[in-house]
Amino acid sequence: VLPLPQIIAALKIGAAIPQRALALTFDGGHISVYHEAWPRLKALGFAFTVFIATDFIDAGSQNYMSWDQLRELASSGVTIGTLGATYGHLVSLKEAKAAADIARANHRFMDEIGSIPELFAYPFGEYSANLQAIVARHGHSAAFGHHSGVIYRGADYLALPRFPLVGGYSNLARFRTVVDTLPLPVADLVPADPFLSNNPPALGFSIVGEMGPLDNLACYLARFGKLNLEQLGPSRIEVRFPEALPIGRNRVNCTLPGPGGRWRWFGLQLLVH
């Protein structure tokens, strides 16, 4: 278990990372992170990141950590990231309002923590090309969604995946699968903007590197199950949806058997409005 900024920095310069290295993240700043998660992880020497919506902290609710508690975490080596101020649907806001939300949060972090977080997490995992650009302009070097997958050096650092471990996915079997998973690197992803203008979208990507035969590549969407794939040439994959995607968040997961019984995984979220 490594600090998330350390993993990002190593990937960007091509430095070695241990096999099965992982980072732990929590969204929202709930008080249970302070009282339950932090003592256990500290005893194990495990680093983690907590993403904060500053309005929730400023409201003073007993359900969320206080600024004093966040300063205590930060001084102990916990990474503090940002969700913006309101934890609202930023992707649906006009550009100026989304930018103002992120900027207001950064001002609060400067006031209370003394620095602007390097890492951003999109509320509800929702992002668009425009929102990615806004996040970058406000000084955040990496941003995370809620789609599943393994990060790798050539990934889009403003659209990084995370494996959720909540609800029905919060069990040891799921955790073991996640830890064993390998990246499925892709390039030339279409559509470039996950905030869809056409529905159903023409989804396609190119597999990067030597992954062996792609006959066993499979992509899934919860609403439709296993999706039809068409391979164009040695590495280009086109995904065919049987009908328009429903309004809201649609997560596509693509897997390919890898070495040693492990799985390669690429995920993305498509947003219909």
Sequence positions of predicted segments:
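Terminal accessory/targeting
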Residues: 1-21, 32-35, 39-48, 52-65, ...
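Metal-dependent polysaccharide deacetylase catalytic core of the NodB/CE4 family, i.e.
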Residues: 8-22, 30-131, 141, 154-164
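A structural signal for short, well-ordered beta-strand segments and their strand-loop junctions
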Residues: 1-3, 121, 143-145
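Acidic, His- and aromatic-enriched active-site or binding-groove loops in soluble protein domains
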Residues: 26, 140-149
